[in-house]
């Protein structure tokens, strides 16, 4: 039996949820939206990225449904990634450019 790698999707992320899901260990938040073509481009690679970085918890955050948190975290473009370690932000890949699998993996590796 093989493992299925599928990050949890959160439609509306609240401040309390953000604190809860990021308080322990490494947490990767991917901000995206259903209408976003660059998010759809990256989506097929996310299970493999998640498997390669299995020490982290991955969450897909709907940027439109979580607009208050997105504004607070200054998420200007999607897809964007914000990484936490034990409740503290340790890195971000936030811009409006299309991201490739290699770019995301290199970014995540750079945080170790």
PLM feature spans:
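Chalcogenol-based redox active-site neighborhoods
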Residues: 2-5, 72-73, 98-99
């Amino acid at each position: 039996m093989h493992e299925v790698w599928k990050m949890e999707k959160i439609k509306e992320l609240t401040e309390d949820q953000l604190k809860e899901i990021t308080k322990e260990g490494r947490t990767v938040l991917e901000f995206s939206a259903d209408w976003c073509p660059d998010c759809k481009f990256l989506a097929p690679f996310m299970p493999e990225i998640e498997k390669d970085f299995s020490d982290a918890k991955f969450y897909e955050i709907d940027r439109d449904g979580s607009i208050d948190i997105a504004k607070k975290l200054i998420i200007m473009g999607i897809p964007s990634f914000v990484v936490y370690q034990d409740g503290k932000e340790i890195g971000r890949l936030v811009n409006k450019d299309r991201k490739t699998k290699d770019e995301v993996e290199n970014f995540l590796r750079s945080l170790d």
